[in-house]
Amino acid sequence: MNLDSSASALSYQSGFGNEFASEALPGALPVGQNSPQKAPYGLYAELFSGTAFTMTRSEARRTWMYRIQPSAKHPAFAKLARQLAGGPLGEVTPNRLRWSPLQIPSEPTDFIDGLVAMVANSAAQKPAGISVYHYRANRSMERVFFNADGELLLVPELGRLRIVTELGMLDLEPLEIAVLPRGLKFRIELLDPQARGYVAENHGAPLRLPDLGPIGSNGLANPRDFLAPVAHYEDLRQPTTLVQKYLGELWGCELDHSPLNVVAWHGNNVPYKYDLRRFNTIGTVSFDHPDPSIFTVLTSPTSVPGLANLDFVIFPPRWMVAENTFRPPWFHRNLMNEFMGLIQGAYDAKAEGFLPGGASLHSCMSAHGPDGETCTKAINAQLQPAKIDNTMAFMFETSQVLRPSQFALECPELQNDYDACWASLPVTFNPNRR
């Protein structure tokens, strides 16, 4: 049986961190055990582990797959001649950096070839840290890919995607995100002529929902709004290239079948998507600007309580009602390191220069805040309830310093005049007037 991945309507399972179960053929899931002597339909049982066996049950992530051919059936991998764009990490710089949107190549480019390394804070073999990429594509993948180096968080800015994975399919559009577990095989098909966006590669603990503390049991990203796929398989006996990223390098081998051949599965180590428009935004209804941690969608913790390996934070449409308050994000010097992107609209701390598809980097203790134009307007504004609308900025925040790639420091999209946006900040100090 070969299910057509071009079908328009997809079904999903709802919830975050659930023990899901799905089968594309009735009775394909074994009952009462994981690895029977003879699995239904002559399938192979295969365990897909996302954490160590001895993790606490609340932290453990694993999925049992029942597939036509096991993943072990492949020849040796060979290092590919064409590696990821971006080059090695560049020189260390404490400077604030901002990039205009990267151009989409004119030559045929799939998701893998369109990945460009921008910043990173650790080598891929370390069990912590993140790497950040841009992706640009103008054709669907014919290859299948998996990433041995970390979990992938995809943030589209332009163009719809269909992500065909071992466990089923996810359709993704701008203002939605997808998370793909480390090692999951997938193929990305374009549903529009071009696609562009951002990828955070999480080398640390898997992403999860942040604790809500005094907010209570509801708010921010609600678990029911996360969607996991249902089983879908390809029974294709044709040459297929399988590519993996291993310690930052691309390796490939040739199969005689599609590796997206899982007929049934159960577990919690699964891909999922989330619509950012469903985020329940929290904010002040009195005065001052709360810390931006109230906008956290997902977090990857470290061993230090409250210190994130990766926080994924958004700045969505919201009402601003604070009285006697400087309403834009305040001026800041941060222990954490902030890589920001923009999906649509404008960011309320920058009047111009920060464009959809662009990015900025403010490293540890790099002073930042609203630009001169935004600051002047905010100081003199008549404070009435106002809605920030038609916007979606986001931030990958991490506790380790992010180093730009050589490409990021040399590309023409780097805005060499970024510091000038603060040059027009007025001096309003007057010792004779309080």
From Swiss-Prot:
Example GO BP: tyrosine catabolic process
Binding positions (Fe cation): 332, 338, 368
EC number(s) from the headed UniProt entry: 1.13.11.5
Catalytic residues, chain numbering: 289 (proton acceptor)
InterPro entries for the chain: HgmA_C, HgmA_N, Homogentis_dOase, Homogentis_dOase_bac, RmlC-like_jellyroll, RmlC_Cupin_sf
Binding site for homogentisate: 347, 368
Cofactor(s) in the UniProt record: Fe cation
A Gene Ontology cellular-component term: cytoplasm
Keyword Transmembrane helix set for record: no
The reaction(s) this protein catalyses: homogentisate + O2 = 4-maleylacetoacetate + H(+)
Keywords, alphabetical: Dioxygenase, Iron, Metal-binding, Oxidoreductase, Phenylalanine catabolism, Tyrosine catabolism
Biochemical pathway: Amino-acid degradation; L-phenylalanine degradation; acetoacetate and fumarate from L-phenylalanine: step 4/6
Gene3D superfamilies, per database record: Jelly Rolls
GO molecular function annotation: homogentisate 1,2-dioxygenase activity; iron ion binding
Record HAMAP family: Homogentis_dioxygen (MF_00334)
Subunit-structure text: Hexamer; dimer of trimers.
Entry function: Involved in the catabolism of homogentisate (2,5-dihydroxyphenylacetate or 2,5-OH-PhAc), a central intermediate in the degradation of phenylalanine and tyrosine. Catalyzes the oxidative ring cleavage of the aromatic ring of homogentisate to yield maleylacetoacetate.
Family: Belongs to the homogentisate dioxygenase family.
Protein name per Swiss-Prot or TrEMBL: Homogentisate 1,2-dioxygenase
Naturally occurring in which organism (per UniProt): Pseudomonas fluorescens (strain ATCC BAA-477 / NRRL B-23932 / Pf-5)
